[in-house]
Amino acid sequence: MSLSNSLGLLGRKVGMMRLFTDEGDSIPVTVVDVSNNRVTQVKTQENDGYVALQVTFGARKASRVTKPAAGHLAKAGVEAGEIIREFRLTADVAAQYKAGATVPVTAVFAVGQKVDVQGTTIGKGFAGTIKRHHMKSQRASHGNSRSHNVPGSIGMAQDPGRVFPGKRMTGHLGDDTVTTQNLDVIRIDEARQLLMIKGAVPGSAGGFVTVRPAVKVKANNTDVKGAN
């Protein structure tokens, strides 16, 4: 199968480690488990109005699957997964797959390729403006008695008499869907279906991520020769 510009893989963030090149340079990498990506449906222009590949990842107990989902998965002949995502494709690429097929990592990615990784960031709960928006704290003394870690003025006087929408204030921090772009694939463990991607990716260890070929490709300056 040829590499696709649109097809990606679902995976689970295992954690971070480092690899060393032949020159002794240390490369921080995130290990992503992309094993057992299974095709649950091939959507076509004639039947669905667009072309896409529906993929599932992970394993879920049959008792935790709704009846409509169970019937959908049984029709494809695959076991229930933890997450299901769609990848928009061209018709010629989608025609290479059938429902029930497994997508191996080497069919989508190669060492040295740029990828975009989407995940859910770690939730921080309710946070103040200093932690949430990196604002500066106020003076510790010299007339300041109770306003050390507050944002200060959030509006104006009677005109306009309101707080403008979008004002940076306290609130929930984290637990957002974030995409980190243009990360390098340093190494692929084909036997265990692992991707080793340079740098950090969103989320905590054990979280689900979606890995796609990079959309905004930049020049690759990473030397991965002999990374082990």
UniProtKB/Swiss-Prot annotation:
Keyword Ribonucleoprotein on entry: yes
Keyword set includes Ribonucleoprotein: yes
GO MF annotations, alphabetized: rRNA binding; structural constituent of ribosome
Pfam families: Ribosomal_L3
Modifications made to the protein after synthesis: Methylated by PrmB.
Gene Ontology CC terms, in alphabetical order: cytosolic large ribosomal subunit
InterPro entries (alphabetical): Ribosomal_uL3 (IPR000597), Ribosomal_uL3_bac/org-type (IPR019927), Ribosomal_uL3_CS (IPR019926), Transl_B-barrel_sf (IPR009000)
Region (Disordered) residue spans: 135-159
Compositional bias of kind Polar residues: 140-150
Subunit structure: Part of the 50S ribosomal subunit. Forms a cluster with proteins L14 and L19.
Role according to the record: One of the primary rRNA binding proteins, it binds directly near the 3'-end of the 23S rRNA, where it nucleates assembly of the 50S subunit.
Family: Belongs to the universal ribosomal protein uL3 family.
Name assigned to this protein: Large ribosomal subunit protein uL3
